[in-house]
Each structure stands twice: as C-alpha cells, then as structure tokens.
Amino acid sequence: MRLLIHTDGAARGNPGPAGAGAILRDASDGTVLAEIAEGLGHATNNVAEWTAVLLALESAQGLGATHVDLRLDSELVARQISGVYRVRHPDLKPIHAAAMKLLRSFDGYTVGHVPRELNKDADRLSNVAIDAPTSMSPSRSPLG
C-alpha cells in the first residue's frame, strides 16, 4: 500500500509550546487513514517538524505501508531527508536517525516540499496539538 503523507511541526516562540501534525492518506484514492496531533511541550520548530515526520512514519509502518510519499512545507527538513543538507543540531540528530531508519524500511519513498497552502490539514493538526489540553494530547486517531 502506498501512502501520501503530509506533515507539519509548529512552535510558538521557537522555542516554545510545540506540536506535531500529520495526515496519512491512501495514495490511490485519497482516503484519510490516520491523523496525528501530538503536543511536544517546549521545543523548537525544527524539532517539531522532524518529530511530525517520525510520528507519521511510525503510523505508516503500523498501517502496513510499503511506499510513502512525504510532503512537507519545511524546505529545510525536505532537503535534509533528501541528503542535500546535513543535520547538525544535536537535538535533531536522534530524531533524524530514527526517521531515516524507518524510511529505509519501506520498499520506496519520495519526499517533496509543498507550499504552506497545500499543507493546511497537517498545519491545522500541529496547531490543535499545541492548543489541546494535556489530557487530549498526544492523540493519534486512526480513521476507519
């Protein structure tokens, strides 16, 4: 199964209250299979962006995906995944390593940068995660 995954991370204050959001769709028909909105406490925007990717990949693996098409509005993270830029910050290295290990476990993957206006669903989820009361976050809701 091939999934189209949109992810976004947000931090208010950078660093500040942060959240990760993702929406996973069946690439063949666009059916939403899962949404992720997870509060991250106090973090930077880049930590939130990378955490959103990692959480989405974990969910994709759990759904049995064989291929993933990642779409992010963070050009930096898209280029780090593609290997154009290196990950240098110590806070990002373990998240990056875990995400790349997961990516390599799929039969194939693509990554692309999309304009913010094409990533509204993931952006909404990352902001929901920041705004949600602690008892509501993290929330990962597979849809059926």
What is each PLM-predicted segment?
Residues 2-3, 29-34, 61-64, 105, ...:
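Intrinsically disordered, low-complexity regions
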Residues 1-47, 51, 55-66:
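RNase H-like nuclease fold core
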Residues 10-14, 53-129, 133:
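RNase H catalytic domain
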